[in-house]
Design a protein with these regions (language model features):
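Short acidic-glycine motifs
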Residues: 1-494
Length: 494
């Protein structure tokens, strides 16, 4: 068994992975009241985790699987939600923890440097209630669990251009870096001269600053902190933000006994979640301070199950079920407008001409300002953002059991259907859906030398990237996968 996997936005249920019998963690098939509870895109996880107080029992089979327990190599797990009874029963729970109840971060034990622990408030609360609607006939059970988490994300230290640098002034910087003019010298870069503006060396004239870079500089302005000094070196900015995680899980189950021979049940489960991971540089984007997906990540998971039994004779029993599970998860950031096209005026980043173009291509491109000594990202650098998963699962089946003496015979049929409908253009570690631009300092340095961070910033201001790229989703992947089976087995007593 492993800890919670994947990001909060990709796994808001905080499902864990389990290896059984030495098999892959993808070999565990989990159901809730017979309804498939798989996560098609991340099959080591489950789609929905009901509140602990809502669970009546968990049946785990790890070997000698029955014919009806397919799609499992390690374990077949069936979780049963509680049912109402002839008596009203209810429970309530509240759990809380904060930074005062937890240990210090292993890397923040120096009280002089870190006088206080990062704020971390977690609250989980809920309850259950069940009872009769019509005694001996109709019963109900409901439960709810809310999770609220707010924590200080960061601090995260970066090197940011100063206000003077963003205006083109690269004088009086640590190490006295020289910014070379790419408009001078030959095609191989030999013969470059130090850049100047009106005779002032290491100055970029305002009319040479790229329009997109100037617009990004305005977004960066509120984040620019202190000047570079010998004491702090390149790390002149420390940012943090308040990350949040909100989740509401609930189940409703109805049981109906129309006559002594029959029983019918139905359940509806849902989980609505919202994850927020603040960008390091506010409106200018940057890396996520909590290490996940930038911005908001809403999610909605729903599960519906119907089932029942019918006793024809004391020896002959029919059981059946139907289930539907839907996942709708997404992670988005700055999608309100095509900023790359409208604000920065960079063609091809958003809008018309984008294959399968839609609002999910909106937002700021990624600007990576890198050097051997430091790096910083502007815009939206996350190569997996945005994403939208809309996955459906259907399952239906029926079994007929016959018993006589020490012998039993059971047969059945099941149909299982899975649909994937995803949007997530991915381009490795560089390309994003909105376009990516890398500035590594080579443009404003001499060939054969090691560019400094300040050369990289100068490249950015001049609008001369060393590398560009963009991730396109040429077609929207849509997968349908179905399984059906018919099985019988007999058991004879000794």
């Amino acid at each position: 068994m492993t800890a919670e996997t994947n990001s909060l936005s990709g796994n808001p249920q905080r499902a864990i992975n389990t290896n059984v019998n030495g098999q892959s963690n993808q070999g565990v098939n989990t159901r809730i009241d017979g309804t498939q509870d798989a996560y098609p895109w991340l099959p080591a996880n489950v789609a929905y985790v009901p509140p602990a107080d809502a669970i009546q029992e968990v049946n785990v089979v790890t070997n000698s699987f029955d014919a009806e327990q397919g799609l499992a190599g390690g374990a077949a797990v069936n979780v049963q939600i509680k049912s109402g009874t002839n008596q009203f029963h209810g429970t309530g729970v509240w759990f809380t923890t904060n930074q005062d109840l937890t240990a210090r971060n292993y890397f923040q034990t120096d009280i002089k440097l870190f006088p206080t622990k990062n704020s971390n408030h977690q609250n989980q609360f809920g309850g259950t209630f069940g009872g009769p609607i019509v005694k001996n006939k109709l019963f109900f059970f409901v439960d709810y669990e809310g999770t609220l988490q707010r924590n200080l994300a960061g601090p995260d230290t970066r090197s940011l251009p100063t206000a003077a640098m963003l205006s083109g002034d690269f004088r009086n910087l640590p190490g006295n870096p020289i910014i070379y003019d790419p408009a001078t010298g030959n095609a191989t870069g030999q013969g470059k001269q130090q850049i100047s503006c009106n005779g002032v060396l290491n100055m970029i004239c305002p009319n040479r600053i790229d329009y997109a870079s100037a617009q990004m500089s305005q977004l960066l302005a509120p984040s620019v902190a202190q000047e570079f000094t010998t004491a702090n070196g390149l790390n002149n900015f420390s940012g943090s933000g308040t990350a949040s995680f909100t989740r509401n899980n609930a189940d409703i189950k109805i049981n109906y006994l129309p006559n002594p021979r029959a029983m019918i049940f139905g359940h509806y489960s849902f989980s609505k979640s919202l994850v927020f991971d603040p960008p390091l540089l506010g409106n200018a984007g940057g890396d996520a301070t909590n290490g996940g997906q930038l911005g908001d990540a809403p999610g909605m998971i729903q599960s519906v199950g119907l089932g029942g039994t019918y006793t024809f004779t004391p020896n002959l029993l029919l059981d059946w079920n139907f289930g539907f599970t839907r996942q709708n998860l997404s992670a988005t950031f700055d999608l309100g407008s095509p900023d790359g096209l409208d604000l920065l005026k960079i063609p091809g980043t958003n809008g018309a001409g984008v294959p399968n173009g839609n609002d999910l291509y909106n937002g700021l491109p990624a600007f990576q300002v890198n050097s051997a000594s430091s790096s910083v990202n502007f815009g939206n650098p996350n190569t997996g953002n945005p994403f939208q998963f809309r996955d459906n699962q259907y399952v239906t089946g029926a079994n007929l059991s016959w018993n006589r003496g020490k012998h039993s015979l059971r047969g059945g049929i099941e149909w299982n259907h899975t649909q994937l409908n995803h949007f997530q253009p991915q381009g490795g570690t560089f390309q994003t859906a909105r376009g990516s631009f890398l500035f590594n300092g080579n443009v404003t340095s001499l060939p054969g030398t090691t560019p400094t961070y300040f050369n990289s910033v100068a490249d950015f201001l001049l609008g001369l990237p060393n590398q560009t790229g963009k991730a396109y989703q040429v077609f929207n992947p849509s997968l349908c996968d179905g399984h059906s089976g018919l099985g019988t087995f007999a058991i004879s007593g000794r």
